[in-house]
Amino acid sequence: MDDIQSAALAIEQLKNCVYEITLGRKGKLTRIILAFTEDDLHHLAGLHKLVDIEQIRSGKRSRIYESILSGTITGDFLKKSARYHEIEARIQALVYLEDMLDGDQLYFKYDPRKKAFSRIEADYLVSGKANNTPVYLFLGSRSDDTYYCRSFFPQ
């Protein structure tokens, strides 16, 4: 099993989990409910960056996810992209996302206007470790207290 298939299996495991996180600041509590779907793999692994692979660029996310799980799309196939080197570390760290979420992490309210270098639209930045590698996880809001993972990458 290669890294991308391991990452897809990690997301598959997380689909069965819901994280309920309560944050407190200045006497105010904020509730975050974090859930996962197969669509999360595409962006978290950075597959959207592989614009030179037609099947990845224009394919339906759920179909790509299933193809990775079944072994039809492999790491060797993705490595044909000239941009694979940009996402390789993300894929390797993504395998340990559940460990990161179950471990110690810091949550920060995220204001994209203060990060001119970033185009990430998110509500929270989570800093933690995945397999002893420092990583950032960005959370976006689906509704009042339901969130999804918007982006993920090693520091």
What does each of the following model-derived ranges do?
Residues M1-D123, S127:
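An acidic, glycine-rich, mixed-charge low-complexity segment common to nucleic-acid enzymes
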Residues S127-Q155:
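Compact beta-sheet-dominated globular domain cores
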